[in-house]
């Protein structure tokens, strides 16, 4: 069940030498915070990212173990080298935590550099990896910034809150307001400062609440999504736990998006029909003097208002958009990882996407917290060519819908013109515009009423088309599919000529995410509404 869910990832940074007498207070403070988060998000699995260094790191890992929070270890170097930093009394604690960890991620050294040449750089890389891939950074810190090293706790807090450090290997911290630091006051050994274990939230707490709420909402709904689904990749690749997790969440997001898309389109259809019914019944009430039509008009209007209110309360439109955005971002990430690329989608999301859907940005960060891909595989058939064919066929389907809508609008226009000139001819021949009509008819007002009703019906039909097909953004979608089909065709040709380069894969991923963001931007303008 948890495979389909986005984990709430708690990153750890802290001092190597907290005061021994504060150990119990600090451990209790960490356990309280973890328990509070679990209570706040009961459907969301929690994972701790921790380097397991002596001092605060090991203390937090042990607190997490006591409250049942999973652990992913992030080591700055190979375990055998890392263990040299540990005193004998802490070495057993380290090895036990590594044994219970879900996974052990070793941050690779800078290309061409020996692992022991710049240990501070390696520790900084591990700290920044944790910072980037966490929803919340839990900092056991004394709050002091002077005389701090580049890889120390203060530097990591600064990176989390201001994005102050640009890590190596292309890692980049995201927008500062999308990451919150929970500061646990932690005096160092030899300090006389009071207040050990005092909690303080640094960063945008309102933004954190939004991210937690959206993540919890998705995970609760993911429990109702069907299990499994057709894999995008060969079955043999399921051994990669990061890819397996990403694909499971992607399938849940895709299933939920389709569910809410059906609800959204059904709502749009109902509102279009009811809006048309309101206009038509009022027209008959007004022109045909059918008094009872006003009752049908009121019933249709009430039903439309109830439908609109229900759609807004269910939030189906937003969920449809955001879950599709999540599914698309994960699909792109899945192909990148399969290809052996180290590009992570959260690093290339557009600024607009980061602002509008910070919870998706955080989800991608959490789901990319794993070992770097080791194998390089050909993705031309399973990604490039399949996506080209998808956009080609989707463009054709959208063009078909657009042509049907255009034909109906054209027909409505012709009918309106014919009825308009028919009305002029009627008035010229039957008495409205001529003092001595050549073709006087009896009951002229009845015929005039019928003509008005016919003209009004054509207008009502046009209103229906605008209320339903107009919300589908067919022309925009058709253009987007054409552009993306051309992109995949061009990239496929370049891969044939130059090979599957990292630059081409990143370009492709960036363009797909940009298209995803563009789609969400204009789709947000198509929220359900009642047009009368």
Q: What function would you assign to each model-found segment?
A:
Residues 1-194:
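Acidic/glycine-enriched connector segments
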Residues 200-414, 421-532:
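Conserved non-transmembrane functional hotspots
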């Amino acid at each position: 069940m948890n495979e389909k869910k986005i984990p709430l990832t708690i990153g750890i940074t802290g001092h190597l030498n907290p005061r021994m007498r504060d150990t119990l207070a600090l451990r209790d403070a960490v356990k309280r915070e973890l328990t509070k988060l679990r209570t706040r998000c009961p459907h969301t699995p929690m994972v701790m990212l921790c380097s397991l260094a002596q001092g605060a790191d090991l203390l937090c890992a042990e607190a997490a173990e006591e409250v049942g929070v999973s652990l992913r270890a992030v080591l700055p170097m190979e375990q055998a080298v890392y263990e040299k930093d540990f005193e004998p009394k802490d070495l057993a604690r380290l090895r036990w935590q590594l044994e219970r960890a879900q996974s052990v991620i070793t941050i690779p050294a800078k290309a061409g550099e020996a692992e022991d040449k710049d240990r501070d750089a390696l520790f900084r890389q591990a700290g920044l990896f944790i910072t980037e891939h966490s929803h919340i950074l839990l900092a056991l810190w004394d709050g002091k910034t002077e005389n701090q090293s580049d890889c120390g706790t203060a530097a990591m807090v600064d990176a989390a809150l201001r994005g102050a450090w640009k890590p190596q290997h292309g890692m980049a911290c995201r927008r500062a307001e999308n990451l919150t630091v929970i500061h646990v006051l932690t005096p160092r050994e030899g300090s006389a400062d009071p207040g050990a274990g005092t909690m303080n939230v640094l960063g945008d707490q309102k933004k954190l609440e939004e991210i937690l709420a959206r993540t919890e909402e998705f995970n609760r709904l993911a429990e109702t999504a069907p299990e499994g689904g057709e894999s995008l990749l060969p079955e043999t690749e399921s051994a990669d736990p990061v890819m397996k997790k990403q694909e499971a969440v992607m399938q849940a997001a895709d299933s939920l998006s389709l569910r809410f898309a059906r609800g959204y389109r059904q709502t749009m259809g109902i509102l279009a029909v009811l809006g048309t019914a309101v206009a038509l019944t009022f027209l008959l009430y007004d022109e045909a003097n059918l008094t009872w039509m006003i009752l049908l008009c009121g019933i249709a209007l009430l039903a439309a208002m109830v439908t609109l209110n229900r759609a807004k309360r269910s939030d189906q439109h937003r969920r449809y958009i955001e879950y599709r955005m999540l599914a698309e971002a994960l699909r792109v990430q899945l192909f990148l990882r399969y290809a052996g690329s180290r590009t992570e989608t959260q690093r290339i999301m557009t600024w607009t996407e980061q602002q509008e859907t910070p919870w998706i940005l955080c989800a991608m960060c959490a789901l990319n917290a794993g070992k770097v891909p080791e194998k390089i595989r050909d993705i031309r058939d399973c990604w490039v060519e399949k996506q080209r064919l998808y956009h080609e066929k989707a463009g054709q389907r959208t063009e078909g819908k657009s042509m049907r809508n255009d034909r109906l609008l054209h027909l409505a226009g012709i009918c309106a013109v014919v009825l308009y000139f028919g009305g002029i001819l009627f008035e010229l021949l039957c008495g409205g515009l001529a003092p001595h009509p050549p073709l006087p008819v009896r009951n002229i007002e009845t015929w005039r009423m019928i003509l008005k009703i016919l003209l009004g019906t054509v207008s009502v039909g046009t209103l229906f088309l605008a209320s339903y097909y107009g919300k589908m953004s067919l022309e925009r979608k058709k253009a987007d599919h054409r552009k993306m089909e051309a992109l995949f065709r061009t990239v496929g040709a370049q891969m044939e000529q130059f090979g599957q380069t990292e630059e081409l894969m990143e370009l492709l991923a960036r363009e797909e995410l940009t298209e995803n963001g563009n789609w969400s931007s204009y789709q947000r303008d198509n929220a359900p509404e009642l047009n009368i």
